[in-house]
A protein has these predicted regions:
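Active-site loop/helix belt of alpha/beta enzymes
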Residues: 1-109
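Residue-identity detector for glutamine
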Residues: 38, 91, 114, 167, ...
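Active-site loop ensemble at the mouth of alpha/beta enzyme cores that anchors a bound cofactor
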Residues: 66-151, 157, 164
Length: 224
């Protein structure tokens, strides 16, 4: 990295070297520990020695690095975080790392889906079992006959149903096909009917897919 930064600084007149940054979690699932972020600071100092000036930006990662700020142990020298999810949602630090963000709205994005079927059905599929539409072998628990609802959305819209957070805490998402989602509402005090709207909170991955889906209507509400 030092050589690349020096090349930009010294030979690429149409580019300005503003700083250096790191991405730890998006692919490699590396935790942004103080030690890992200190490696970035050390690289930044080597770059500064090479180019003979201070860097404007030393970016310590994205939303997953914000827990270092909350713990008060982010290394000195990091002056930037590229935070998006924790401002817009915020859910990931709470559900994935156990860090609540007090004072932040967690309902900026709400997914709404319509109920298109309500029926009592066996909880364990009837027949010889193989794989689902995506080549997986789901595990089913026999709970007898359960009240199930079918929603008009599926894997194509939000990627992974396990990352949907129902606002009704008494329902269970059982699974999905490419364009439908199945929920168990047997234990819910609310009685569900065809045409009802079910609401979900989102985390980063589901929100990413929904925002890019042409099948999902986006409604912007300005309370002011």
């Amino acid at each position: 990295m030092v050589d690349v930064c020096a090349e930009v600084e010294e030979h690429m007149d149409n580019l300005d070297l503003a700083g250096v940054g790191v991405n730890v979690g998006c692919y490699g699932s590396v935790v942004a520990t103080p030690e890992k972020l200190q490696e970035l600071v050390d690289v930044a100092r080597r770059v500064e020695e090479r180019i003979g000036r201070k860097l404007d930006i030393v970016s310590g990662g994205a939303s997953s690095s914000y827990m270092r700020v909350l713990d008060g142990n982010i290394p000195e020298g990091i002056n930037n975080l590229r935070i998006g999810e924790e401002i817009l949602l915020p859910q990931d630090l709470l559900y994935l790392y156990g860090y609540p963000l007090n004072g932040m709205y967690d309902d900026v994005f709400t997914l709404e889906s319509q109920v298109i079927e309500v029926r009592d059905k066996p909880s364990y599929p009837v027949g010889e079992l193989g794989v689902d539409a995506f080549g997986h072998k789901p595990v089913y628990i026999d709970k007898g006959i359960r009240r199930k609802v079918l929603l008009a959305m599926g894997h194509l819209d939000y990627c992974d149903y396990k990352d949907l957070i129902p606002q009704d805490k008494d329902v269970e998402i059982l699974g999905c096909s490419s364009d439908h989602t199945i929920m168990d509402v047997t234990d819910a005090p609310r009685t569900y009917h065809v045409g009802d709207i079910v609401k979900f909170n989102l985390i980063y991955g589901t929100n990413l897919f929904l925002c890019h889906s042409q099948n999902v209507q986006k409604v912007f509400i300005d309370e002011e």
